[in-house]
Amino acid sequence: MREKIDVHAASPGAEASRTLRIDLHVHTLASDGVSDVEAILEAAVKAGLDAIAITDHERIDAALAARAIAEGRGSPLEVIVGEEITTRGGHLVGLFLRRRIRPWHSLRSSVARIHEQGGLAIIAHPLVPYPLCASARTIRRLMDEPDPVFHPDGLEGFNPTTARMRWSRRAPAFAEEVGIAAVAGSDAHAAHHVGRAVTTFRGEAVAGLRGAIARRDTGWEGEPYTWREQVRMFGHQQRKNAAAIRDEVGGKVRRDGTGRDLGYPGGRARPARFDRTAAGLGEGERA
């Protein structure tokens, strides 16, 4: 039986018109997801979300494509360009990015790089004793830095992948202790998981997310993934990886050198590029 968690936080005097729901952690075929951008966008609309953040590992090209497609269609869904960055201190989600953040730098410098381009830095699935998860000690050390450029803006108080682990249950209280916002995202790797966990806040538009995080005025809704769902997803990812290897080996013959399809317009190339024409955009239109 699924355990649904619904936590809303709002300042008593907040003037706002409605509760907005945003999934801040979504992967596509461009990294280790198994669904293409079109399927992700469709699922987000069906889930009634106001926005999603595409946060592929170490890349933002599919996120740029998703945003351009949504805007080009006049969709009410907003797409936040993000990235899940592998740092030496654990995974870090960057939101509202303009440029890719390179992996394997320190967590401290990666947070600063996100802030330098006007983005938000969110610690992904914290506290779990695993190399890809930031420890409490590491996060406290960042928050003790005298320069706020090194301070993360928030951490995942709920991630359905790790929510059943006892360490993750401490995350909301830990966020309160160190003085940063607790948010949530589905960490979806397939379209049908989009919206499984969302960040909520009171506001009039998605642009208000920045202020809500700064005020620590966010809540979340979510359901943990079952172990069966996680095992099934691992199997899907392994089959995808096997197919990708076949495409890499056979791509020159089948596609005249274009390589594997990364699941968005213009994605059939390495290194990946965003093809404006394939997305239905002219040269003068913004991506």
Question: How should each PLM-predicted stretch be described?
Answer:
Residues 102-105, 115, 119:
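Core dinuclear metal-dependent hydrolase active-site scaffold
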Residues 1-30, 34-43, 61-67, 74, ...:
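Charged catalytic cores and adjacent phosphate/nucleic-acid-binding surfaces used
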Residues 77, 81-86, 127:
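Short glycine-enriched loops at secondary-structure junctions
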Residues 122-132:
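Aromatic-lined carbohydrate-recognition surfaces of secreted/lumenal glycan-active proteins
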Residues 29, 40-61, 119-122:
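Divalent metal-dependent hydrolysis catalytic cores, especially in the metallo-beta-lactamase
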Residues 57, 126, 160:
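Flexible loop residues that form catalytic
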